[in-house]
Amino acid sequence: MSLVAGSLFFSANASADLSSGALLQQMNMASQSLNYELAFVSINKQGVESLRYRHARLDKQPLAQLLQMDGPRREVVQRGNEISYFEPGLEPFTLNGDYIVDSLPALVYTDFKRLSPYYDFISVGRTRIADRLCEVIRVVAKDGTRYSYIVWMDTETKLPMRVDLLDRDGETLEQFRVISFTVNNQVGSSMQSLAKANLPPLLSVPAGDAANFNWAPSWIPQGFSEISSSRRQLPTIETAVESRLYSDGLFSFSVNINRATANSSEQMLRTGRRTVSSTIRDNAEITIVGELPPQTAKRISDSIKFRAAQ
């Protein structure tokens, strides 16, 4: 059953509103510039998590903390462009990054000007979430090949109060929902200790070997572009895996190809937003992994073209 509020109705003929894109861009700016604290729940097919997220800007750099409120204490801290992870039973570590991936939905950090040629931003109206009046906006791909979002944005602060990720049938895959929040400079003051804390060392991630591949997809959804490629030797298989990573600024997927083995098999699996599609063709195992509907993943896989080795 869809989690979309039954009280929210909108016309199927609603047209894209240019001001909706501007509002979404304001949400992007507010989320990264204000001092605030959110208590929220994250709901998906695996269950419900209760979390707290704090964000401030100190000395012109972002400082943020994500804390799991139930069960074992899991904490993620951002200072500048370094993200540190603390979890029971694991050695703490730090990675480079622009924001805490598991905090606010990725949509919040998106450049909506870049998305505008490929997505419609549709104003749905206004409703209340967390006792706040919110603008409601749908973010829908124009070509119908991707998932969509509905955003409930506080009209005053422009912070997201609720974000639903929907599949192509309108079923809710994930929901971010704020329970309570605070916006004031005291949030920044309470985070001063994090600004001075000793964080774990930066973990170096080995880069894959750059290479020219003899394959490429002949079709990908409009707006996606290749952002990296690599060849890696994985411990679980004997042959190297060649990978291309694509993104449209909102969703991403990778195309991974290795020589087929006796253990290779075809499969199509979707868990929440993530689809894994594996096919065998021309003695190669083609695996699409990413935030795509299964039908789109299959179309990309079927479009892979191999050229003769030089």
Question: Where in the sequence are the language-model features?
Answer:
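Gly/Pro-enriched, hydrophobic low-complexity segments
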Residues: A130-N198
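Short, well-ordered beta-strand elements
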Residues: V163, N283-E291
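Short, solvent-exposed recognition patches
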Residues: N198-D282, Q295
